[in-house]
Every structure is written in structure tokens, then in C-alpha cells.
């Protein structure tokens, strides 16, 4: 497999079609699926809805938003990837209940999950902002998220705008390349448009650092819908929070689980698998991933586990041969991964390779070869 150049910055730099469900908020209008916005809320069970981006493999991604109605207010899990996304969430909540948003839980620091908070605080300034201690620490560093902390940073916003416009133009060029299959060219055209639509909605972005943190667990109690916040261990990031609704048997995982293409980049595999071990001890019937449609069984978790174990196995075997990292990447057999994750064309393979396989294999190979992992927001030793 050739080394893929998509890194975590590509995911966060800007920043599977679905129709409005029968339970969608009437305040959210029907619209095109490529306008850079979250889809209307879908009801999962009594008092619980979620919002997600259109079912495509966009690079300018938006994390899922969970809406939980308790007796005295609404708990949100994540907020979208822009101030405008947060305002959309507020409108969606207003279409479901007259209760205020009382808490916003941040599952992890990646931009597409916490940057909607300012738009929500405009309407609900007293809402609690909650995250793990590690996530709050990372969000307080402007070098990590690349946007201002506490207020917009015009210089950083210009830098991100330039990067987005450059990526959009690159995709338009790929879409015009006659050697690229037409189905893939169509995806490039749509992606180029989506990036610019997301950019249009990101002109006010900045970080609100969570004022309330936890290390292991925290309870937001309620007679009907108690919400348990959990830190089960390191996985996609060093500070992942999961949300468990025991009476509804529903778990929201943040990017610990993402479908149809998992996100991994530079995270070590062993602690991630250990976190999945902890997750599977819960008796959930519904899993809300950080991206993608809800899951009603554990088959995708099994695929995710298989992929991690196979990446690690191949990395160990190749490290024993004395291969260089570049040689190992070239010999890394991704065919079964493409098959199991449904990457059946060049477009889907691009995202699976870039968002998951390349970075995860690099990290696993370096560990197997005894190369110290570079420290960073998500990387570094276990």
C-alpha cells in the first residue's frame, strides 16, 4: 500500500443521503443534502434523538450530535463543527421541546465535535460544558485545534480558509481528470462543493474550553433518563468520553467508533482494544457512533476489532523482516480491510486508507520496530 498523505489535519482543516424521519423537528426545514449542514434530528427512543451529516464520505466532516431530554432540560452530546452548526442544533431542540439546553458533553477535542458550542451558548448561556480532563486540556491549546480560544482568531481563520479553498480546487481538478472513473469524479465534484459550503459556515469559529471535567465517570441524574459519562480509556484520542443511558440501553461513543470508515490516524492499538473490551461489557442495544448511522448490533464492532488486530499482526510480521517503514507500507495488504469495510471503489478506498489504515499501520509498525512514538495531541506512547 502506498503511503497516504491524508493526515489528521485534513480531517480537521474544514471543519451513510438521509430523509427527514417522521420524528424530525418541524423547525428544521427540508433541504439539499450537500449544503454543509447536519440533517434534521431522528428519534432513537423516547426522549432521545440524534443529528448527523449526509451519508457520504466527506472530508470536511461533522460529528453526530445526540439530543437527550431530561425532566429539567436537555443534555447534548457534542455540538457540531461550527458556530452555525450549534445554531442549527438550537433550532432542532426548539422543534422537539421547550426545555433549555442545560449541559453539553464534549466526547473529544477534534474540531467537528466541540466548535458548535458558542452557537448554543448564545441561546443557553448557563449550559454546563463537560469533558474529560485531558480533552479540556487539549482544547485550551490553540495550537491543537488551530482556532482561537475564547474568541475568534482572524489569522488562524484565514489560514484554515486558504487550506479549504486549496483542497476544494484540488478536488475540482481531480473531477476534471478523464483518467479518473466517472463515479469517483462525481464524488470529487460533490466534495469540492461540500468543502466550500462548510467553509461558508465556519467564519466565526472558536473554542469554548469546558469548565467542568471528570476523570473516570460523572452522572447527570434524572428519574427517567439518567446519563452516565464514562472515560473507559484511551482510544481515538487521549481523552475520549462515552455516554451511557442505562434505561434506554444506548451508548454514544464519540469517535471511539465511527462508520462506515473508522478514524484512527496515529493512535496506538492496544489501549483502543482495551477500551472496546470495557465498552462491550455494557448491555447496549443501540450504539450511536461519532459519525455515521446508529448501530443496532455488534457486527461493526467485530469488524473494527478484526481490523486493529490484523493491522498489528502485519506490522509485527513486517518489523521482524527488517523492513523500513516505507517498505512495510508498500507490503501492507489492505485488500481484506477494503472488503470488510465496503471500500469497493477508488473513492472509498482513499478514505479508508487515509483516515484509518495508513496512520494506524505506521503507529503499529513503529511500535513493533521499537521506534519511539512521536508525542502529540493523539499520538505518543501508551
Regions found by a protein language model. Name each.
Residues 7-16:
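Bacterial N-terminal signal peptides
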Residues 35, 320-382:
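C-terminal regulatory/interaction regions
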Residues 41-95, 241-255:
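Conserved beta-strand hairpin/beta-sheet module of binuclear metal-dependent hydrolase folds
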Residues 43, 188-189, 203-245:
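Core dinuclear metal-dependent hydrolase active-site scaffold
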Residues 77-79, 102-110, 130-133, 232, ...:
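Active-site neighborhood of phospho(di)ester-bond hydrolases with catalytic His/Asp-centered motifs
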Residues 94-210, 219, 313:
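Active-site HxH/HxHxD metal-binding segment of metal-dependent hydrolases
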Residues 224-282:
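Active-site-proximal loop/helix segments of hydrolase catalytic cores
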Residues 250, 273-327, 331:
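Divalent-metal (often Zn2+) His-rich catalytic cores of metallo-beta-lactamase-fold enzymes
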Amino acid at each position: 500500500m502506498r503511503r497516504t498523505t491524508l493526515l489528521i489535519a485534513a480531517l480537521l482543516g474544514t471543519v451513510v443521503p438521509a430523509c427527514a424521519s417522521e420524528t424530525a423537528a418541524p423547525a428544521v426545514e427540508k433541504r439539499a443534502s450537500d449544503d454543509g449542514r447536519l440533517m434534521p434530528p431522528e428519534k432513537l427512543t423516547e426522549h432521545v434523538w440524534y443529528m448527523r451529516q449526509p451519508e457520504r464520505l466527506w472530508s470536511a466532516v461533522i460529528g453526530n450530535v445526540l439530543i437527550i431530554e431530561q425532566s429539567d432540560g436537555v443534555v447534548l452530546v457534542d455540538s457540531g463543527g461550527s458556530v452555525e452548526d450549534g445554531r442549527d442544533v438550537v433550532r432542532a431542540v426548539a422543534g422537539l421541546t421547550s426545555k433549555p439546553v442545560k449541559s453539553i458533553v464534549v466526547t473529544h477535542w477534534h474540531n467537528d465535535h466541540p466548535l458548535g458550542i458558542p452557537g448554543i451558548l448564545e441561546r443557553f448561556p448557563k449550559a454546563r460544558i463537560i469533558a474529560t480532563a485531558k480533552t479540556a486540556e487539549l482544547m485550551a491549546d490553540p495550537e491543537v485545534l488551530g482556532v482561537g480560544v475564547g474568541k475568534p482568531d482572524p489569522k488562524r481563520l484565514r489560514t484554515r480558509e486558504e487550506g479549504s479553498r486549496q483542497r476544494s480546487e484540488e478536488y475540482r481538478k481531480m473531477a476534471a481528470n478523464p483518467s479518473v472513473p466517472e463515479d469517483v469524479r462525481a464524488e470529487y465534484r460533490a466534495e469540492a462543493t461540500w468543502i466550500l459550503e462548510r467553509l461558508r459556515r465556519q467564519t466565526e469559529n472558536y473554542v469554548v474550553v469546558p469548565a467542568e471535567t471528570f476523570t473516570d465517570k460523572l452522572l447527570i441524574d434524572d428519574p427517567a433518563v439518567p446519563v452516565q459519562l464514562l472515560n473507559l480509556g484511551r482510544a481515538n484520542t487521549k481523552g475520549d468520553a462515552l455516554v451511557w443511558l442505562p434505561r434506554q440501553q444506548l451508548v454514544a461513543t464519540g469517535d471511539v467508533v465511527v462508520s462506515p470508515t473508522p478514524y484512527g490516524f496515529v493512535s496506538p492499538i492496544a489501549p483502543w482494544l482495551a477500551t472496546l473490551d470495557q465498552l462491550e461489557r455494557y448491555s447496549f442495544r443501540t450504539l450511536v457512533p461519532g459519525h455515521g448511522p446508529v448501530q443496532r448490533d455488534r457486527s461493526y464492532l467485530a469488524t473494527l476489532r478484526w481490523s486493529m488486530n490484523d493491522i498489528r499482526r502485519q506490522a509485527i510480521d513486517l518489523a521482524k523482516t527488517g523492513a523500513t517503514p516505507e517498505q512495510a507500507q508498500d507490503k501492507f495488504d489492505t485488500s481484506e480491510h477494503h472488503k470488510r469495510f465496503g471500500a469497493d471503489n477508488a473513492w472509498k478506498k482513499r478514505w479508508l486508507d487515509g483516515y484509518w489504515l495508513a496512520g494506524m499501520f505506521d503507529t503499529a509498525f513503529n511500535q513493533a520496530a521499537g521506534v519511539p512514538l512521536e508525542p502529540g495531541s493523539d499520538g505518543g506512547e501508551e
